[in-house]
């Protein structure tokens, strides 16, 4: 096992909704950064194959946004199973970070973790139990220093890789303007 104990694993999922009991994963993307938030590697991006029934019965928000982004069609066309995405995602992070060292990093990452825990438990086992959740800092900035939020740029693409890059950039803004580091 290679990797650095201080590297961070960033990920984002797109799902058919917000409830892991009834919804499923549509897309996963991963980025590895060092502790200073410099991107070291972009991992695999998988659109998970889903049936028409699953895609046609997403909640209205997902039907609209995943339709606009092209993700729905990518899932219809995909031949990638969740098992394959899990195996390849785990292999990728194992190259960069030893098991149990990186928190799960991202925006509202607790939500993603619920889905990973249910659908990708072998992958979830690679992470430290802690989360690095950028949305927590956003909530603090909103209350304690709202002017910082003006410097955060969001495109709202709702594609996993774009969302990760935005989360990393957002944390850099908070580091500079909120924490003043």
From Swiss-Prot:
Keywords annotated in UniProt: Cytoplasm, Exonuclease, Hydrolase, Nuclease
Active site: 129
EC number assigned by the record: 3.1.15.-
Gene3D superfamilies the record matches: Ribonuclease H-like superfamily/Ribonuclease H
InterPro entries: Exonuclease_RNaseT/DNA_pol3, Oligoribonuclease, RNaseH-like_sf, RNaseH_sf
Annotated GO CC locations: cytoplasm
Family in the record: Belongs to the oligoribonuclease family.
Record PANTHER family: OLIGORIBONUCLEASE, MITOCHONDRIAL
Full protein name: Oligoribonuclease
Organism name: Colwellia psychrerythraea (strain 34H / ATCC BAA-681) (Vibrio psychroerythus)
Lineage: Bacteria, Pseudomonadati, Pseudomonadota, Gammaproteobacteria, Alteromonadales
